[in-house]
Design a protein with these regions (language model features):
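Catalytic active-site module of serine/aspartate enzymes centered on a nucleophile-bearing elbow/loop
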Residues: 188, 193-222
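Conserved alpha/beta-hydrolase
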Residues: 6-25
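Short beta-strand/loop motif that positions the catalytic acidic residue
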Residues: 154, 160-162, 166
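Catalytic nucleophile-loop/oxyanion-hole region of alpha/beta-hydrolase
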Residues: 24-50, 55
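Catalytic histidine neighborhood in serine/cysteine hydrolases
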Residues: 12-15, 175, 179-198
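Short alpha-helix in the alpha/beta-hydrolase fold that links the catalytic acid
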Residues: 1, 156, 170-179
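Gly/Ala-rich beta-loop-alpha elbow adjacent to hydrolase catalytic centers
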Residues: 58-62, 66
């Protein structure tokens, strides 16, 4: 998406690597929710000197971070994609609490590899950890609680995007976030179909890219 927005609008885009991500699972085990917010703030500070306005665009947990951090940092607008309001069913709170006493990781259990993806070629190029660190799930729960408290404080324009075919973070999560944005100056929601959770890489990605482009362009002109 960053490459698309740069090509279409000439925007400077930064893909923030959150603490514990894209390295090794044991690095994720050591990460806390405050490390993730610090990663966002670091990225914001890198862009601040090079941009007139900054937008947050976040996928999944990145969407929750975008909502929360928009109340702490000066941004022009936010785009959330497949953002959770509650913990995915794969990580019920009781399971996290119980297993945390004697396990470090939980296996990924939702079907065979590629389940939920519509573009199988895109899935082949998708890289993720093979295990779910239990501590990270507990930290995500804390982050979501913080996001809930922050929703009424979000005042910037927000575009919420979710796939109706997302079986990991169910579509009703977007509705609950939308309802919670009681003070956003502009809020829009978009449902797409024919994609799973990672809509920025799955079959509906072009529609998602164009929606984000049009939203940012519109807000920039106001």
């Amino acid at each position: 998406m960053g490459e698309y927005l740069n090509r279409e609008l000439g925007f400077t885009c930064l893909g923030v690597r959150l603490a514990g991500h894209a390295t090794r699972p044991k690095d994720m085990v050591r990460s806390r929710w405050t490390d993730w917010t610090a990663s966002v703030e670091d990225g914001y500070n890198l862009l601040r000197g090079a941009a007139d306005h900054i937008y947050f665009v976040g996928l999944s947990m990145g969407g929750a971070l975008s909502l929360l951090m928009s109340t702490r940092l000066d941004v022009k607008g936010i785009v959330t994609i497949s953002a959770p309001y509650v913990m995915p069913d794969e990580h019920p709170a009781w399971q996290i609490q119980l297993y945390s006493y004697f396990k470090t990781y939980l296996p990924k259990t939702k079907g065979e590899p590629g389940t939920g993806w519509f573009d199988k070629d895109a899935f082949k190029g998708h890289i993720s950890y093979p295990l779910n660190p239990i501590r990270s799930a507990a930290e995500l729960k804390i982050l979501l609680d913080k996001m809930h408290m922050a929703l009424p404080k979000v005042t910037v324009p927000a575009l919420l995007i979710h796939s109706k075919d997302d079986t990991y973070v169910l579509p009703e999560n977007m509705e609950r976030i939308y309802v919670g944005l009681v003070n956003a100056s502009d809020k829009t929601k978009l449902y797409v179909t024919g994609s799973g959770h990672v809509v920025t890489r799955d079959a509906a990605r072009q529609q998602v890219f164009e929606a984000a482009r049009d939203f940012i362009k519109r807000i920039n002109e106001t």
